[in-house]
């Protein structure tokens, strides 16, 4: 592993040395990065089964930002390789690719459409949270290589341009699948649409109203077998919500982006209709000092809701949904020590609540209700050094703890991480 890591880092070091000599590459840009990290629980298993390991992640990215008259074409593609020092059976290639066309007409009509796809190793609590039901086929052990593939297409349209009054609408289609055959219960499809309006009373204050509708299939439940082949039924769900939004530039150093609304969800996997208040808040404060403070809050049914993207999925519903109600909180503080050195501290908390989830129990031959709560707390401290405009070096350490209390085998775990990342960009 040591020689492998050095071999990977060598070309990056040469690139860092030559960073100031490259010519402008517009409209293209490229990035290469190397991450070396140590985790005390690489598979996010229960504490009594955890294994520590060193992991190397090598990634190469290419991007395009091309103006096409009044429109713009954006595209990016990347490939990465994860290598484990001890558990080399988990070594894997991953990728990401996406394209988007931002268009506008002579009038105030504009929009965007595009697609993206990605593939990566599934890690419990990182890529998404699976649901483990009683007396269903045992999901793939987290120590087995299980690749998660996501596909997503979208379209947006807006009328109003920079004027005070805007009308907008959009739609998304998403699909997620897993490579392990006995993990297919977590495969998901989702279609969503949204429409709304915004009104700016001033350049610093914008109000909005948006409605969202989505339907999908999740989870897939085994209800029996025929000829030794499991019979799976896809649970269908529908979610409807209405949200009021506000964007406020309170001062030159304070920006608030918030929403509050009401959601109803029906699902074959739920014993009754779920109704709850949803919302989000992102507040950024940059006082006249070296500090930047960001606070995020969110309440939703997004199964993909993560602490690194608190506000995703409220305005544009492209996150996959699930049968849990999720509350999240995020705090991030950055201190600019010098023009090239930043210190960063972040903390997050998530609370997922499952109630009256109905699933077919193959042992009893009838539906049973399961419920529970999953709570995850994490923090990370890091230092970021930017020796040149196109080079970065970041090192840090953190800890994540999850507590599961449920009738569907939501186990607890803890993971300590130490990580360093070196990156170079060519623009």
Residue ranges of model-derived segments:
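Bacterial N-terminal signal peptides that target proteins for export
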Residues: 1-9
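N-terminal signal peptide c-region/cleavage motif recognized by signal peptidases
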Residues: 18-20
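Gram-negative and organellar
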Residues: 23-427
């Amino acid at each position: 592993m040591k020689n492998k890591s050095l071999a990977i880092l060598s070309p990056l070091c040469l690139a860092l040395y030559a960073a100031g000599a490259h010519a402008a590459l517009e409209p293209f840009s490229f990035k290469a990065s190397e991450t070396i990290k140590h985790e005390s629980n690489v598979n996010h298993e229960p504490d009594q089964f955890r294994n520590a390991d060193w992991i190397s992640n090598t990634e190469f990215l290419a991007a395009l930002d091309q103006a096409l008259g009044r429109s713009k074409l954006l595209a990016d593609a990347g490939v990465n390789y994860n290598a484990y020092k001890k558990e080399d059976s988990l070594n894997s290639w991953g990728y990401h690719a996406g394209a988007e066309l931002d268009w506008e007409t002579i009038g105030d009509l504009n929009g965007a459409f595009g697609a993206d796809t990605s593939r990566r190793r599934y890690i419990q609590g990182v890529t998404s949270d699976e649901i483990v039901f009683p007396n269903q086929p045992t999901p793939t052990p987290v120590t087995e290589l299980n690749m998660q593939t996501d596909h997503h297409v979208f379209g947006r349209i807006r009328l109003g341009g920079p004027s005070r009054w805007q009308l907008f609408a959009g739609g998304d289609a998403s699909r997620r699948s897993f490579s392990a055959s006995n993990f297919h219960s977590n495969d998901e499809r989702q279609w969503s649409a949204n429409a709304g309006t915004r009104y700016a009373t001033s350049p610093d204050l914008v109000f909005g109203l948006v409605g969202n509708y989505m339907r999908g299939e999740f989870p897939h439940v085994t209800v029996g077998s025929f000829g030794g082949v499991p019979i799976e039924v896809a649970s269908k769900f529908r979610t409807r919500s209405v949200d009021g939004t506000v964007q406020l530039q309170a001062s030159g150093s304070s920006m608030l982006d918030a929403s509050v609304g009401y959601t109803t969800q029906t699902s074959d996997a739920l014993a009754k209709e779920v109704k709850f208040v949803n919302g989000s808040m992102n507040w950024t404060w940059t006082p006249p000092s070296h500090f930047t403070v960001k606070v995020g809050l969110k309440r939703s049914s997004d199964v993909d809701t993560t602490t690194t993207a608190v506000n995703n999925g409220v305005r544009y519903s492209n996150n996959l949904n699930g049968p849990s109600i999720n509350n999240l909180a995020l705090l991030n503080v950055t201190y600019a020590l010098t023009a090239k050195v930043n210190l960063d501290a972040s903390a997050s908390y998530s609370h997922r609540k499952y109630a009256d989830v109905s699933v077919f129990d193959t042992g009893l031959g009838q539906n049973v209700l399961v419920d529970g709560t999953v709570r995850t707390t994490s923090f990370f401290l890091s230092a970021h050094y930017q020796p040149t405009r196109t080079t970065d070096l970041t090192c840090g350490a953190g800890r994540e703890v999850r507590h599961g209390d449920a009738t569907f085998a939501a186990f607890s775990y803890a993971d300590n991480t130490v990580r360093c990342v070196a990156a170079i960009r060519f623009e």
